[in-house]
Amino acid sequence: VTLHFVLPGDVDDPTSPSGGNVYDRRVIQSLAKLGTAVREITIPGTWPQPSHTARARLDQALAGIEDGAVVLLDGLVACGVPEVVVPHAGRLRLVVLVHLPLADETGLPPSVAARLDAAERECLHAAGAVVATSPWAARRLAGHHGLARVHAITPGTDPAPPATGTDGVSRLLCVASLTPRKGHDVLVEALATVTDVPWTCAFVGPERSGGPVRDLIAQHGLADRIDLIGPLTGKPLDRAYATADLFVLPSRAETYGMVVTEALARGVPVIASSVPDALGNGGLLLPPDDVTAFAQALRRWFTDEDWRRDLRSRALTRRTELSTWDETAAELVRVPASLRA
């Protein structure tokens, strides 16, 4: 049985890496290893709010798939356009993979968020099955949209050697696109309270709306301490993790937080918000949008050697519990197998 996988057009764009794109690509690689035939269908467009041309291209792609076939749709492509997807639901076995509920993206005008939310609900109710990338996200989707069942299939990790770090204390790393949802402003404000101790912090990720963060860094005089590195993938990203002493992610909302497990796979201590499923007991979970909590945690990190040792130990323990991408793919392939043709 061939699995048709509908993906956003930028799934392999190195200038816009995202957790969703990495999940899609790694699952495809593991499905191939497991002997599942996958046909990739990439649809360029400004998803989830595409042009008429992109909608027509998606409709055409779905129309070209034989009746009864299994189609896995990335939610970024599917959820905003139920008028395209729903008419095909009767003849195709549709599985929608939701990386982030559309209305959860920070900074959307309320009217746009409401429209996307309604579109997503219509699309998910028409699907044969819905998959979320964490238990929290599965519960949220089921409750919010009134769905009977949402499968939770968490991202895998790649085995990696433990990070050597820099000096065990001073090199901080944040891997996240510069968008309001990722909370870089919270981290900058917190870092501004600990300028009396030596540290540098690398911000790795595409600048989708980086202007306000740059302004805030300049306002606090931290341009010589915070490096805006831009997007990294492959070996350069591996090097960034390997030299990190502490990983920090101040997100306002995450469905899972794959970058957290990438840090934990290397035994890097983590201080983060909005990532309970990814973090487990592997680090310190803080409330989102809480500058004071992040400032206090950073102060403790820099001044309390025993606590640093404890965080490191917790990260190394969590490292042994993380699942692989092959396990993720094996779980995912069982979902459409349960759907009747």
What is each model feature region?
Residues V213-L232:
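Nucleotide-activated donor-binding/catalytic signature segment of Leloir-type glycosyltransferases, i.e.
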Residues P269-A272:
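Short hydrophobic beta-strand element within catalytic cores of glycosyltransferases
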Residues P231-L232, R239-A244:
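Short alpha-helical donor nucleotide-sugar binding micro-motif in glycosyltransferases
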Residues R252:
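Aromatic "clamp/platform" in nucleotide-sugar-dependent glycosyltransferases that forms part
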Residues T157, A163-K182, V188-A192, A202:
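Conserved donor-binding/catalytic core segment of Leloir-type glycosyltransferases
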Residues G283-T292, R300-E305:
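Conserved acidic donor-binding segment of nucleotide-sugar-dependent glycosyltransferases
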Residues V175, T200-R214, G230:
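Glycosyltransferase donor-sugar binding loop
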Residues L102, S111-V130:
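Membrane-proximal helix-turn-helix segments that form the acceptor-binding/catalytic region
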